[in-house]
Amino acid sequence: MCGIVGYSGKKEASSILVEGLSKLEYRGYDSAGVAILNDGKINVSKCKGRLVNLENKLEENPIAGNIGIGHTRWATHGEPSDLNAHPHSNKDNTISVVHNGIIENYMQLRTWLKSKGYEFKSETDTEVIPNLVDYFYEGNLLDAVIKAISKVEGSYALGIVSSKEPDKVVAVRKDSPLIVGISEDGNFIASDVPAILNHTRDIYYIKDKEFVVLTSEGVEFYSNEGEKIEKELNHIEWDANAAEKGGYEHFMLKEIYEQPKAIRDTMTSRIIAGQPIKLDDISITKEQIENIDKIYIVACGTAYHAGVVGKYVIEKFARIPVEVDIASEFRYRDPIITKNTLMIVLSQSGETADTLAALREAKSIGARVIAVTNVVGSSVARAADDILYTWAGPEIAVASTKAYTTQLITMYILGLFFAQNKNTLTNEEIEKIKADMLTLPEKAEEVLASKEKVQKFAANTYMHKDMFYLGRGIDYAVAMEGALKLKEISYIHAEAYAGGELKHGTIALIEEGTVVVALGTQSDIYDKMVSNIKEVTTRGAKVLGIAAEGRKGMEEVVDSVIYVPEVNDMLLPVLSVMQLQLLAYYVSVEKGCDVDKPRNLAKSVTVE
């Protein structure tokens, strides 16, 4: 949520800032702006709406300069407007700030600053920052920022410039993402890697309450006591092309079709036929695994749905009790945690605020934490005891696809890893599941090559206002993800229900023409699922069925059925969900929705 870019270098800042902000559009925003230093003055241009509005404004009134900060805003305090857009400045426009996060004590700070003679123009929490920095400024911008931050409560990633020190950008973060990039042509700050990939792949990850001083000549890092510190430079392996559409109409479609490779990459070196599973970034011992008495899987949104699949997998493979929690609920419910409790957190970005808070809460009371994330060096990765990366590559579309399927792969890997250490599955059983896993990339390609039925169903149902998704067991977990995908990008009301719950109330919603998507991939409950489908079709529902090859009977009771290749039942969610992703995509396209940037949503939810 919100995107920050800062630059100091040899080139014109305006074009670099706008380009960087365009690479952060996936994070969600409602306004945009830049502040650029030139001839000892700060020039600000900002406006409500899409980034193109800012581009047009800068074309009409160009701003020269080689140092500046830019921002895309997601409204939290104050409505979307030109006035509330960032950057925000102090009264005499000598200090400008961009901010991602929430200042929790801004009302107290605002009242205190007003008592000191400061005035406020916007409704935002951010505006207290430039005024605080101004209050503490005594000739050194870094010192003033450190003192100002000592008064602030909440989350923040900040980029700050001052006409009093026009050669630098000062930045700091706490609970909101911020990286630093370096190159021969200049140096950068940004909320995420794609913003600066066209210029550099050499980056630093910033920890909470570490301060950055960025100039055209270099970068310096400081502790919150103002002491200089050294940081490790990291090199990003993927390049800017990975964050481009590559000929696809939308990022989401590209990322759906990248899933076979993402699945293969996530298994590489971890799932090898005839060899034990070895996880290099996980140090948990066999004895510790044997002593685990309970696992909490904690996540938000799509990652939560992957966690629900993980519950089925780990309990079946490793026979360990698993509870799945929404992160924003977990941290407030006083969970029962012992020294033998394991927490697994899932977060694509590694910066999800609620997940990070839940992780820290669990660690503070003694739980060991394994993080599953797609971003190396992210806050979640740094805070956890052990890490299991999903090698999905950059995911730009707001609606997650390949991050979800690779999270499923990590659940299978962990389930087998625990089973291997607890001896709850024989070596033969583990090898058989691994053999099936190794076929998933090829079978995923097969699924994605047959899209005609789902396209046709989308074309015939996109005008409906409601859709229902049904499943039993692990299929119910997949149904939840399918319903979320549809509502995220098509704005159609969609809900998932367990098949056995139909007669306990939900069936009252079924009438002539109601659209239902029914998953029946699990062999042990397939016949029961077919019976559930009959319950809705006899009441006039229009049903798309999804089943594994070799299952009989569904084609007789649904309007259309899509078969996915047969593998171990536990692995079928990887294949069946791809048809649900395609359904959501094609329904959204039929409706003319903004597939990659749906309304009101942000890719990375970095505020609670």
Swiss-Prot record:
Annotated active site residues, numbered on this chain, are: C2, K603
Outline the extent of the Glutamine amidotransferase type-2 domain. 2-217
Signal peptide coordinates: none
Domain SIS residues, every copy: 285-424, 453-598
- What is the reaction catalyzed? D-fructose 6-phosphate + L-glutamine = D-glucosamine 6-phosphate + L-glutamate
What InterPro entries would the database entry show?
GATase_2_dom (IPR017932), GFAT (IPR005855), GFAT_N (IPR047084), GlmS/AgaS_SIS (IPR035466), GlmS/FrlB_SIS (IPR035490), Ntn_hydrolases_N (IPR029055), SIS_dom (IPR001347), SIS_dom_sf (IPR046348)
Sorted UniProt keywords:
Aminotransferase, Cytoplasm, Glutamine amidotransferase, Repeat, Transferase
Write down the superkingdom of origin: Bacteria
The UniProt entry, under CDD domains, shows: GFAT, SIS_GlmS_GlmD_1, SIS_GlmS_GlmD_2
Any one GO biological process: fructose 6-phosphate metabolic process
Record carries keyword ATP-binding: no
GO MF, one example = carbohydrate derivative binding
Enzyme category, top tier:
transferase
Question: What EC number(s) does this enzyme carry?
Answer: 2.6.1.16
Q: Where in the cell is it found?
A: Cytoplasm
Q: Which SUPFAM superfamilies match?
A: N-terminal nucleophile aminohydrolases (Ntn hydrolases) (SSF56235), SIS domain (SSF53697)
PROSITE patterns reported for this sequence: GATASE_TYPE_2 (PS51278), SIS (PS51464)
Instruction: Check the record and name the Gene3D superfamilies matching this protein.
Output: Glucose-6-phosphate isomerase like protein, domain 1, Glutamine Phosphoribosylpyrophosphate, subunit 1, domain 1
This molecule's function is given as: Catalyzes the first step in hexosamine metabolism, converting fructose-6P into glucosamine-6P using glutamine as a nitrogen source.
Oligomer status and interactors: Homodimer.
Question: Mind telling me what this protein is named?
Answer: Glutamine--fructose-6-phosphate aminotransferase [isomerizing]
Organism equals Clostridium acetobutylicum (strain ATCC 824 / DSM 792 / JCM 1419 / IAM 19013 / LMG 5710 / NBRC 13948 / NRRL B-527 / VKM B-1787 / 2291 / W)
